[in-house]
């Protein structure tokens, strides 16, 4: 009788019922997070096709180009939202940081597009676009902040194993540094 009592604790278990995610699950999730961000990075890598000699085509060309960029950022944000409840305890924190960064990029692009669309001459068009380019450092800082969040959330090593994250880290700056 004593043996049976000793073998069965009879008490309630305090162990968590939540399964610990495998590293492979976290890497796969992180790859999706970086893939969502990479969609915007790739969209931002091309230059607008513009005709500097025709003010109406200049305005339309830049506005259309910005419209495709806003759409890419919107897709990234939507894709990120779907990843908020990932397998890592800090999933939501990391994804929210990425969403915030994408939101800043979207605001800059949408505000520039609005200025372009309301401009009445080529000088205003060029000024609005030049202002946006002048804020490119803000965009780069946004990317650096997301990279920093990888480390703060303990996901830096995982990010190095995710193919889409490697692509983000190796992405050269499209902004001239001179």
Predicted ranges, named:
Residues 160-178:
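Short, low-complexity, Pro/Ser/Thr/Gly-rich segments in the mature regions of secreted, periplasmic
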Residues 14-68, 170-174:
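Immediate post-signal-peptide N-terminus of mature secreted/exported proteins
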Residues 75-99, 111-124:
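Short, solvent-exposed, charged loop/turn and helix-capping segments
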Residues 31-38, 42, 63-74, 96-110, ...:
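Generic structural signal for well-ordered, non-transmembrane alpha-helical segments
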Residues 8-11:
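Bacterial signal peptide processing site
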Residues 3-6:
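C-terminal motif of bacterial Sec signal peptides marking the signal peptidase cleavage site
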Residues 121-127, 173, 177:
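Long, low-complexity or tandemly repetitive, helically biased scaffold regions used
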